[in-house]
């Protein structure tokens, strides 16, 4: 579709001759997805669509207790330290951003009164600023008023290097200006096509200045609020047992009418995905189970129990294997996997190419994930306009052997290939979870046929995905050769998702392993393309830049994509719970209710 045709269609929407839904459908047909189509209309001055979800309760409270299960247990309740998705989810019970992404990919205001727009004079056409108008009358859970000062403080808190906030990248290249007590202006250092980043979604959760001010910078980890949140959300904090249980109660002063529906909320952590699915779908002990990474065959069997249903939310999640570019077995200045080292064998491109051929993605899809994951060669799989057509995957043990032979990796007496005294022996870690252990087994079996020794390691999920900087077994530490997990894409734009390969995002001791570049891969070419995409306002040119980034990562075998995974949840039969594939599951927790 040419630019002229696109502009004509947008004009038809603005004139009321073409419905927003029909426009979105046409964009999807040519490789765009709902979130990007919505952003395009918004940039053209068309208002966001009304959410499709209908909230039926006519008063707040009265819904009893909502019992939810997260088999990866939360370990902290501070959104700007929440490396793991499960910690972000727990924070959404109590904290809120200015806006969130709903399941239909609409940007919905929550602490803001409206979404910025060109027509409203709150969005710059040159991409250099955006104005957010804040709700008035909103109170923190302790009764203090929510104002622009809290937004400015959150920005200052996140960008302070001593804080080591995982959200820092969203706030780094902007300045926040206070217009009045309920209006802020974000001034960007350069044209910013994706302005809905800071203060939006999980990275946008706003902190109360009056409670966190004494704990800025290097004191940030000492704040009582890290474990006992005081937010503006629908539920007030009651109790937290890290790695086990989060409890909240209704916020009777909540700023949205007739919400929330439930009187109390419980977020139980631990166990495994299968037991979580069973507790909702078969026994009905719980109302909601998060992130059901369970074989599809088992899910279908559990659904037959009649107590609940499986929900699938399309998004950009990718189950992938990471290859460590550094040496996890050598310590430098008190840290392993230091960027001052390089991996002794994975630094050989031939070895990485061979490993890429030894991952049987088709079998993983067919025998493990089914409708909950499809095989892919790409790291960036959504929105559709950003999917590369230049990559492909192949499972070929013979070709892997040929590559290793040609590169001089000879089999030793034990069958393991070696060269210059270095063996192809790798520790391959992931979280304890049946599909992941089956995935590990499939990879291990193929690797052994190519003379590569694989030692599998399975870490308790609550430990592996912990945000604890002192825990050496977390995935950001990456103290093994290979590791696997699902990384989510919690927003419609790939900018944040793809910054996890930027050199300035390297996870290290210096930033308390809060950096998003877990593989420690560094590429000047990638950095340059990413910087270009940050300021490119033409959506077509920008899409091409993200495709180039994906292709660089895949060509260098920095990661091995396995399956693209939508979000999968278990919901009790009567629970109405909008879940977005572009935000946290609990982003709309205020709208959840139980039908009579």
Annotate each language-model stretch with its function.
Residues 73-120:
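Protein kinase glycine-rich loop
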Residues 35-44, 97, 158, 367:
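Hydrophobic membrane-targeting alpha-helices
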Residues 29-33, 91, 555:
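Hydrophobic alpha-helical transmembrane segments of multipass membrane transporters and ion channels
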Residues 167-216, 239:
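Surface-exposed binding/hinge segments that line
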Residues 2-18, 22, 26, 50-60, ...:
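Extracytoplasmic/periplasmic ligand-capture domains
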Residues 562:
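Active-site-proximal polar cores
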Residues 39-71:
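C-terminal segment of N-terminal export signals and the immediately downstream linker at the start
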Residues 23-48:
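N-terminal export signals
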């Amino acid at each position: 579709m040419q630019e002229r045709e696109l502009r004509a269609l947008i004009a038809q929407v603005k004139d009321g001759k073409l419905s927003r839904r029909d426009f979105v459908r046409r964009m999807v047909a040519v490789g765009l997805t709902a979130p990007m189509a919505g952003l395009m209309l918004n940039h053209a001055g068309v208002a966001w669509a009304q959410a499709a979800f209908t909230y039926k309760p006519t008063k707040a409270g009265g819904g009893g207790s909502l019992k939810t299960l997260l088999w990866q247990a939360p370990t902290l309740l501070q959104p700007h330290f929440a490396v793991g998705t499960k910690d972000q989810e727990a924070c959404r019970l109590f904290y809120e951003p200015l806006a969130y992404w709903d399941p239909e990919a609409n940007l919905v205001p929550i602490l803001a009164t409206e979404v910025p727009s060109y027509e409203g004079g709150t969005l710059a056409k040159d991409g250099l600023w955006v104005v957010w108008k804040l709700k008035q009358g909103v109170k923190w859970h302790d009764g203090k008023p929510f104002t622009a000062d809290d937004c400015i403080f959150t920005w200052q808190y996140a960008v302070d290097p001593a804080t080591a906030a995982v959200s820092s990248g969203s706030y780094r290249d902007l300045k926040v200006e206070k217009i009045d007590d309920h209006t802020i202006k974000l001034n960007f250092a350069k044209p910013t096509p994706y302005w809905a980043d800071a203060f939006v979604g999980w990275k946008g959760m706003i902190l109360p200045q009056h409670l966190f001010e004494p704990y800025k910078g290097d004191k940030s980890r000492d704040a009582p609020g890290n474990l006992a949140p005081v937010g503006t959300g629908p539920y007030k904090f009651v109790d937290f047992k890290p790695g086990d249980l989060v409890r909240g109660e209704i916020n009777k002063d909540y700023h949205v009418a007739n919400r929330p529906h439930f009187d109390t909320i419980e977020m139980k952590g631990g166990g495994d995905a299968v037991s979580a699915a069973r507790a909702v779908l078969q026994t009905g002990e719980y109302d909601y189970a998060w992130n059901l990474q369970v074989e599809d065959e088992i899910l279908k069997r559990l659904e037959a129990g009649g107590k609940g249903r499986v929900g699938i939310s399309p998004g950009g999640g990718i189950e992938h294997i990471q290859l460590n570019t550094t040496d996890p077995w050598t310590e430098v200045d008190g840290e392993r996997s230091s960027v001052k080292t390089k991996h002794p064998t994975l630094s050989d491109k031939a070895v990485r190419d061979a490993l890429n051929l030894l991952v049987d993605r088709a079998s993983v899809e067919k025998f493990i994930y089914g409708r909950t994951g499809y095989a892919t060669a790409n790291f960036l799989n959504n929105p559709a306009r950003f999917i590369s057509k230049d990559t492909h995957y192949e499972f070929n043990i013979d070709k892997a052997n040929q590559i290793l032979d040609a590169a001089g990796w000879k089999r030793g007496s034990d069958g393991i290939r070696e060269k210059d005294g270095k063996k192809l022996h790798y520790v391959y870690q992931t979280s304890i979870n049946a599909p992941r252990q089956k995935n590990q087994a499939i990879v291990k079996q193929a690797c052994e046929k190519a003379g590569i020794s694989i030692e599998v390691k399975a870490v308790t999920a609550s430990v592996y995905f912990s945000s604890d900087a002192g825990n050496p077994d977390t995935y950001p530490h990456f103290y093994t050769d290979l590791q696997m997990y699902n990384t989510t894409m919690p927003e419609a734009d790939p900018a944040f998702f793809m910054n996890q390969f930027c050199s300035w995002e390297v996870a290290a001791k210096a930033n308390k392993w809060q950096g998003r570049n877990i593989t420690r891969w560094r590429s000047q070419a990638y950095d340059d393309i990413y910087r270009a995409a940050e300021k490119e306002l033409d959506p077509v040119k920008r899409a091409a830049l993200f495709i180039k980034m994906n292709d660089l990562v895949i060509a260098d075998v920095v990661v091995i994509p396995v399956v693209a995974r939508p979000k999968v949840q278990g919901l009790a039969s009567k629970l109405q719970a909008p879940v977005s594939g572009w935000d946290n599951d609990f982003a709309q927790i205020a709208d959840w209710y139980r039908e009579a």
